[in-house]
């Protein structure tokens, strides 16, 4: 849309007039009363206050209206005959009668009667925000959203073209284009809007502040669980419309985001941005300033719990358990109290964790799509319906091959231990004449009479042999249980080589762990650590007279008393010597 819409010819062109100085009233006018020129070469259909740029489709021409002739009552539309005398410009009339409509989307070929409708439609498709607030420079996709946003500014705002002031709170309608063209001028640098609180809206539940009322409304759905945006193709619902738009792409093959390098397409913009890292070579764009870790996405950096050297600064006041994140501490503190902040909106029950509330809410669901064809009873899962139908058919799916007892579930059959009621033992061993009730028990017994060579399966750890693979699997021999390592001096067995090496020092007398403060040595490291605590305590209590150190403060006090007594005795002897002639 590089070409601009040329204005229809006028029979009585107006003479250009010099711009008159503006005399502003004491009370600033509202935005609806504020007039702006129809546009410039760069913005022929736009409003300089709202920052709107409107251009029609270049491939289509607007319906041409008949020019005004002398003696005629007034201009009329050449297509529909609509009277245009009350309009300041023929552009304000969009003809609805002709089929040659002026504003058509180049992507989906949808036709619009007004340029603003086309612009809003294209912005939603391309996820652009061309409607910019003149106060805070915030962008919006819809003009109505910008008008609603203007009500949040209560300070006086200057027009960027004619320097008039107006109240954005009264801006319910966009500015009209009835005034003559004025030269554009930049706004004065010394005039700024009145500062407002950054986040004036707060959540009544968790007191979290927000800058815009729409953000607060979207946040409140977290507490209420409301999901007003439902998918028409499945039963899923979402709390935000953008989530629904992303979800709908899973039902279709639409992939609107295309890589300009390799022409690979994606369903979501975030996937395309992540893919572009492969071409740019910047695989980790976000870096933590504390631990120097890199992340591909900013969300990963924000969720990264940076705690250098494994620190856990958040400690519970009840049990002194430490945590890395304050959220983990708050979640843990609920175990010590009766607080249940997650309440069910259908019953008075409360829960300490959110996942417990979500699991409980499933019990309130009344949807039972699986109906029984005989009694019309409904079930939430097809397996529950299958088990229920056994009541009508009197059939059991799982039967015991020994006693023919039936069970509804396979787990009940596995737990069933079938034992014949009679005391007969018809299965006898031909070697030792021992009798058994089952043939499987006799076969298992006969393996005990087999020679070692007849057992093909051998454990490589304990050298035991087995006849069947099931026995070999159940054996589960591993070094952690069998203690395969044996001491060559006392034949004591150990599980691990480190245990055996530590034990060998008993026989060799080796003491590899030496104290750096004294000449003592130890066989085990834990003994050295315990000994070094003695030196640490010695450093705490030092005598100020002679520098000697002690393990206990009582010993230091007793030692200091000796210095005090000696000093007192020396002072008394000096006084006596001074009195003698």
Curated annotation (Swiss-Prot):
Pfam families: zf-C2H2, zf-H2C2_2. InterPro entries: Znf_C2H2_sf (IPR036236), Znf_C2H2_type (IPR013087). SUPFAM superfamilies: beta-beta-alpha zinc fingers (SSF57667). Coiled coil: none annotated. GO terms for molecular function: DNA binding; zinc ion binding. The modification Phosphoserine is found at residue 280. SMART domains: ZnF_C2H2. Disulfide bonds: none annotated. Residues 1-22 have a biased composition (Low complexity). It comes from the Eukaryota. One of its GO terms (cellular component) is nucleus. Residues 1-39 are annotated as: Disordered. It is found in: Nucleus. Keywords: DNA-binding, Isopeptide bond, Metal-binding, Nucleus, Phosphoprotein, Repeat, Transcription, Transcription regulation, Ubl conjugation, Zinc, Zinc-finger. A zinc finger (C2H2-type) spans 75-99, 103-125, 131-153, 201-223, 229-251, 257-279, 286-308, 314-336, 342-364, 370-392, 398-420, 427-449, 457-479, 485-507, 513-535, 541-563. There is a cross-link at residue 129 (Glycyl lysine isopeptide (Lys-Gly) (interchain with G-Cter in SUMO2)). PANTHER family: ZINC FINGER PROTEIN, ZINC FINGER PROTEIN 672-RELATED. May be involved in transcriptional regulation. Belongs to the krueppel C2H2-type zinc-finger protein family. This is Zinc finger protein 319. It comes from Mus musculus. The lineage of its organism: Eukaryota, Metazoa, Chordata, Craniata, Vertebrata.
């Amino acid at each position: 849309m590089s070409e601009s819409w040329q204005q229809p010819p006028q029979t009585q062109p107006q003479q250009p007039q010099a711009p008159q100085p503006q005399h502003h009233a004491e009370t600033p006018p509202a935005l609806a009363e504020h007039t702006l020129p129809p546009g410039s070469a760069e913005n022929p259909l736009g409003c300089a206050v709202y920052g709107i740029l409107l251009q029609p489709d270049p491939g289509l021409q607007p319906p041409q209206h008949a020019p005004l002739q002398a003696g005629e009552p007034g201009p009329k539309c050449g297509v529909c005959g609509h009277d245009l005398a009350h309009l300041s410009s023929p552009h304000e009339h969009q003809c609805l009668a002709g089929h040659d409509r002026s504003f058509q989307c180049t992507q989906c070929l949808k036709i619009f009667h007004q340029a603003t409708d086309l612009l809003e439609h294209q912005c939603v498709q391309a996820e652009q925000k061309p409607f910019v607030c003149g106060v805070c420079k915030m962008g919006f996709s819809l003009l109505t959203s910008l008008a609603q946003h203007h009500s949040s500014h209560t300070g006086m705002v200057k027009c960027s073209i004619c320097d008039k002031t107006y109240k954005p709170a009264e801006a319910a309608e966009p500015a009209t284009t009835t005034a003559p063209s004025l030269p554009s001028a930049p706004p004065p640098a010394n005039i700024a809007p009145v500062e407002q609180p950054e986040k004036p809206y707060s959540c009544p539940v968790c007191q979290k502040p927000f800058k815009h009322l729409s953000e607060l409304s979207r946040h409140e759905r977290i507490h209420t669980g409301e999901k007003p945006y439902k998918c028409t193709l499945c039963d899923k619902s979402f709390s935000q419309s953008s989530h629904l738009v992303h979800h709908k792409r899973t039902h279709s093959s639409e992939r609107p985001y295309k890589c300009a390098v390799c022409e690979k397409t994606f369903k979501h913009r975030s996937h395309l941005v992540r893919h572009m890292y492969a071409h740019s070579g910047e695989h980790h764009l976000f870096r933590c300033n504390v631990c120097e870790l890199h992340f591909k996405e900013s969300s990963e950096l924000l969720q990264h719990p940076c705690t250098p050297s494994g620190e856990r600064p958040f400690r519970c006041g009840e049990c002194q358990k430490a945590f890395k994140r304050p959220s983990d501490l708050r979640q843990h503190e609920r175990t010590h109290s009766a607080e249940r902040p997650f309440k069910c909106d259908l019953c008075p029950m409360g829960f300490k964790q959110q996942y417990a509330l979500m699991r409980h809410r499933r019990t309130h669901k009344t949807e039972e799509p699986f109906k029984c064809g005989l009694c019309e009873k409904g079930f939430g899962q097809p397996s529950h319906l299958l088990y229920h139908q056994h009541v009508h058919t009197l059939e059991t799916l799982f039967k015991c091959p020994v006693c023919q007892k039936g069970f509804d579930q396979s787990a009940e059959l596995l737990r069933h231990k079938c034992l014949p009621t009679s005391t007969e033992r018809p299965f006898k061993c031909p070697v030792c004449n021992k009798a058994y009730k089952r043939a499987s028990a006799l076969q298992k017994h006969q393996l005990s009479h087999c020679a070692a060579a007849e057992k093909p399966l051998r454990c490589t750890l304990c050298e035991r042999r087995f006849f069947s693979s099931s026995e070999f699997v159940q054996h589960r021999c591993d070094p952690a249980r069998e203690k395969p390592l044996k001491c060559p001096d006392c034949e004591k067995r150990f599980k691990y080589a480190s245990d055996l090496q530590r034990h060998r020092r008993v026989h060799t007398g080796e003491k590899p762990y030496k104290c750096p403060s004294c000449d003592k040595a130890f066989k085990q490291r834990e003994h050295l650590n315990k000994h070094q605590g003695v030196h640490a305590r010695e450093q705490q209590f030092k005598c100020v007279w002679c520098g000697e150190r002690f393990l206990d403060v009582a010993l230091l006090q007793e030692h200091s008393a000796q210095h005090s007594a000696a000093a007192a005795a020396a002072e008394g002897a000096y006084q006596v010597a001074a009195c003698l002639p």
